[in-house]
Amino acid sequence: MPKRKAAGQGDMRQEPKRRSARLSAMLVPVTPEVKPKRTSSSRKMKTKSDMMEENIDTSAQAVAETKQEAVVEEDYNENAKNGEAKITEAPASEKEIVEVKEENIEDATEKGGEKKEAVAAEVKNEEEDQKEDEEDQNEEKGEAGKEDKDEKGEEDGKEDKNGNEKGEDAKEKEDGKKGEDGKGNGEDGKEKGEDEKEEEDRKETGDGKENEDGKEKGDKKEGKDVKVKEDEKEREDGKEDEGGNEEEAGKEKEDLKEEEEGKEEDEIKEDDGKKEEPQSIV
């Protein structure tokens, strides 16, 4: 069996390369760096009076130091002339320090007044700018409201016009219909009136004819009755005269009655025929 070769240095070097290639192929999730938020520390707000006092103290110390330096230089020069090198410091007097403080206070008050004036001017300018902005906004709102009102008024006017037009059209249509209906009714009424007039005329003519026929019939009947009565009287007279001819007289009476009845039937038929003629015309 062949022995395996021990892993040399070359093999040891190749392994990490392979691992690095594999790792490079892998996607590494990128985590964004989270920066710690700065916490706002509570700072003491210095008042104007504190600031004024600090400025006055620092300025007084600076003036006192300059005066001390000037005194030291003079003494040094005098001692140098005399061959001595002693340095003597002249203490600053309290009066000078107080004067310097007062001067610094006056300067600070003047500066503070100027600052106050500047701040007040800035505040006024800001207020004026705000007022102007508000006025501009109000003007824009007013213009927008006016435009909306104008648009609404125009729309309402259009609706009114359309409504009026529709109402006028409806009225015209209704009037036209009524006129047409009235005309039709009038024409129908005229036709009906004419028909009624014709019927009345026909009735009147028929009534007149009937009256005339009735009168004629009455006259005829009266004439017949008179004739019958006269004949009866004559017969009675003849009976009285002739006594024996009663049978003949009775026969004659029967014949006369039959003739009269036949005539009456003929007249009734003629009257019925006359009445039927105007009805057929209607």
Swiss-Prot record:
It comes from Homo sapiens. The modification Phosphothreonine is found at T31. The modification Phosphotyrosine is found at Y76. GO terms for molecular function: chromatin binding; nucleosomal DNA binding; RNA binding. PANTHER family: HIGH MOBILITY GROUP NUCLEOSOME-BINDING DOMAIN-CONTAINING PROTEIN 5 (PTHR23145:SF6), NUCLEOSOMAL BINDING PROTEIN 1 (PTHR23145). GO terms for biological process: chromatin organization; negative regulation of apoptotic process; positive regulation of cell population proliferation; positive regulation of DNA-templated transcription; positive regulation of gene expression; regulation of DNA-templated transcription. Residues 37-46 have a biased composition (Basic residues). There is a cross-link at K101 (Glycyl lysine isopeptide (Lys-Gly) (interchain with G-Cter in SUMO1)). Ubiquitously expressed. Preferentially binds to euchromatin and modulates cellular transcription by counteracting linker histone-mediated chromatin compaction. Belongs to the HMGN family. Residues 81-119, 139-152, 158-256, 271-282 have a biased composition (Basic and acidic residues). The lineage of its organism: Eukaryota, Metazoa, Chordata, Craniata, Vertebrata. InterPro entries: HMGN5 (IPR040164), HMGN_fam (IPR000079). Disulfide bonds: none annotated. One of its GO terms (cellular component) is mitochondrion. Keywords: Chromatin regulator, DNA-binding, Isopeptide bond, Nucleus, Phosphoprotein, Transcription, Transcription regulation, Ubl conjugation. The modification Phosphoserine is found at S93. It holds the Pfam family HMG14_17. This is High mobility group nucleosome-binding domain-containing protein 5. It is found in: Nucleus. Residues 125-138, 257-270 have a biased composition (Acidic residues). Specifically targeted by its C-terminus to nucleosomes in euchromatin. The gene is HMGN5.
